[in-house]
Amino acid sequence: MATDGENGRHQEVGHKSLLQSDALYQYILETSVYPREPEPMKELREITAKHPWNLMTTSADEGQFLSMLIKLINAKNTMEIGVFTGYSLLATAMALPDDGKILAMDINRENYEIGLPVIEKAGLAHKIEFKEGPALPVLDQMIEDGKYHGSYDFIFVDADKDNYLNYHKRLIDLVKIGGLIGYDNTLWNGSVVAPPDAPLRKYVRYYRDFVLELNKALAADSRIEICQLPVGDGITLCRRIS
């Protein structure tokens, strides 16, 4: 029987993939993801890899998943909270029809501008409205205006984990019935099942409780159907049903 080491199993919490085998994850990337990755996304992925915070980016397999998902639900009006250099934003923009729209929000425009030339070169900038700054005040204003209720087909959240529940309380009103909200990092480096004495990085330990709280709240929310998947760092899809 092969040992854990022989199977390529990883033990450290905080791994690039939740799969237990590096070789298996690489197989997925090289067989099904990279060969079908559009050239603009490949270019942006390679640019982002040079960024000191490159771990913040959406993985290539998750980008592929988001693209497929958006096409399956025929999304047209979307929102993204947490943009970084824009890899997931680019995946969304490429999947939307030509008249599709994305409201994209991030506290750091500088990172967004790293990917913006790629987005512009791909002819997709017209689909994106970028707002710099905290998202919560924008969401509160949209709800107060009244005209945005139930207007979004798809919303992707990959931002400050300590505000995920605050986002959910607002986004549930903005997504349409039958629409989807995707929360990223809901398995949080695998730390959601780590023992109390696990050697977690400081930021992983800090945000873990917020992720656990979110997961519990989503599971109890009767307004949505949920599906949590081990794609990337874990993504939970919430389909609004009421």
UniProtKB/Swiss-Prot annotation:
Binds 1 Mg(2+) ion per subunit. Disulfide bonds: none annotated. One of its GO terms (biological process) is methylation. A divalent metal cation binds at D158, D184, N185. Keywords: Lignin biosynthesis, Magnesium, Metal-binding, Methyltransferase, S-adenosyl-L-methionine, Transferase. Pfam families: Methyltransf_3. PROSITE patterns: SAM_OMT_I. It comes from the Eukaryota. It catalyses: (E)-caffeoyl-CoA + S-adenosyl-L-methionine = (E)-feruloyl-CoA + S-adenosyl-L-homocysteine + H(+). Substrate binds at K16, D158, N189. InterPro entries: Cation-dep_OMT, SAM-dependent_MTases_sf, SAM_O-MeTrfase. GO terms for molecular function: caffeoyl-CoA O-methyltransferase activity; metal ion binding; S-adenosylmethionine-dependent methyltransferase activity. SUPFAM superfamilies: S-adenosyl-L-methionine-dependent methyltransferases. Its EC number is 2.1.1.104. Pathway: Aromatic compound metabolism; phenylpropanoid biosynthesis. Induction: By wounding and viral infection. The keyword Transport does not apply. Mostly expressed in the bottom and middle parts of the stems. Its cofactor is Mg(2+). S-adenosyl-L-methionine binds at T58, E80, G82, V83, S88, D106, A135, D160. Belongs to the class I-like SAM-binding methyltransferase superfamily. Cation-dependent O-methyltransferase family. CCoAMT subfamily. Methylates caffeoyl-CoA to feruloyl-CoA and 5-hydroxyferuloyl-CoA to sinapoyl-CoA. Plays a role in the synthesis of feruloylated polysaccharides. Involved in the reinforcement of the plant cell wall. Also involved in the responding to wounding or pathogen challenge by the increased formation of cell wall-bound ferulic acid polymers. This is Caffeoyl-CoA O-methyltransferase 4. It comes from Nicotiana tabacum.
